[in-house]
Design a protein with these regions (language model features):
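Glycine-rich, acidic/polar active-site loops that bind/position phosphate-bearing ligands
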Residues: 1-325
Length: 325
């Protein structure tokens, strides 16, 4: 709420639309969750291949009865993976809706004898689950301030500055957008997860930030690294705080990258100044701990308590011996 007030004082309302991905797994004879899937459907498949279509429909209908407005619902790339997109709304309402959404999905899946998980990477060898965050700012007359029809890409100076702020601070806030040890198993090459700090308005899903093709009142930026394990209040506060910092300091984003970054060599990425996200929770914590920006954003109490909790989690993981080893 403190960060929302800062936006309000600058004349802005922060609007957000999340794309929530999750898996539906079978349960065993005791009702305990497994990682077994009951279908092998793929992106936008339909019945009879998408065997969970009725489950997803039941989830959507129940959410609509609860007052949610659902923008889209479809099968995702991995078997048993699904996406439900919530309608654009103010950030606080969206954060509340994400929390309610996750509880509702788990409850309704259980009615169908399935286990719903928002774990970022529950299975190796397939795509993980993210929660892309679409963002824009509106002025006091509810006009989208990211719009400038005179710009070649239709983006305003405020939009570029907001995006630049996120790109500039993303390493420091990654532990807020990707909070689990498991989050970083998703952020690896080869599974459509964004790991490179760049942006593009082309049909290119390798950069961290994508500018969807819709313009006018629908102009927005899409941050593609967050996953559904986030605390949405902290993650959205971090995104907004970074964006506002970009506006205040009139930051400029780097040149857009319209080529496929995944296929570039390390030398090509280095020459173009393309950096990457932290590769582990431990690395993300180090960047977070050294950030005065994040400490001022969250306040000392939340900043240090969050670090203590996540650092304990990281130390516990490091002491474990995995099956792979």
């Amino acid at each position: 709420k403190k960060i929302l007030k800062q936006a309000e004082d600058m004349g802005y309302t922060f609007l957000v639309g999340p794309e929530c991905e999750f898996f539906l797994f079978q349960t065993d004879e005791e009702g305990k969750p497994t990682t077994k899937t009951h279908e092998m459907a793929g992106y936008f498949d339909v019945s009879p291949i998408d065997m969970a279509e009725n489950v997803r429909r039941d989830i959507v209908l129940n959410l609509e009865e609860m007052g949610f407005v659902i923008d889209a619902s479809h099968h995702e790339i991995a078997p048993a993976q699904h996406e439900i997109d919530l309608q654009y709304a103010d950030a606080l309402s969206t954060a509340d809706n994400i929390m309610t959404f996750k509880m509702a999905v788990k409850t309704i899946a259980r009615r169908h004898g399935l286990h719903a998980t928002f774990m970022p990477k529950p299975k190796a060898g397939v795509n993980g689950s993210g929660m892309h965050i679409n963002m824009s700012l509106a002025d006091k007359d509810n006009r989208n301030v990211f719009v400038d029809e005179a710009d070649p890409l239709g983006l305003s100076r405020v939009a570029y500055q907001f995006m630049a702020g996120i790109l500039n601070h993303i390493k420091e806030i990654t532990v807020l957008t990707n909070p689990l040890v498991n989050s970083y198993k998703r952020l690896v090459p080869g599974y459509d997860a964004p790991i490179y700090i760049a942006w593009s308005a082309a049909s290119n899903r390798s950069p961290l930030i994508r500018i969807p093709s819709s313009r006018g009142s629908n102009t927005r930026i899409e941050l593609r690294c967050p996953d559904s394990a986030v605390n949405p209040y902290l993650a959205l506060a971090a995104c907004l705080g970074a964006g506002l910092d970009g506006i205040r300091n009139q930051m400029e984003p780097p040149v857009s990258v319209d080529d496929n970054i995944y296929t570039m060599t390390e030398e090509e990425r280095r020459q173009r100044g393309i950096q990457w996200l932290p590769e582990t929770l431990g690395e993300a914590l180090e960047l977070y701990a050294g950030s005065n920006f994040v400490r001022e954003l969250l306040g000392d109490h939340i900043f240090y308590k969050y670090f203590e909790a996540k650092n304990a989690e990281w130390k516990k993981f490091r002491a474990e011996v995995t099956d792979w080893e």
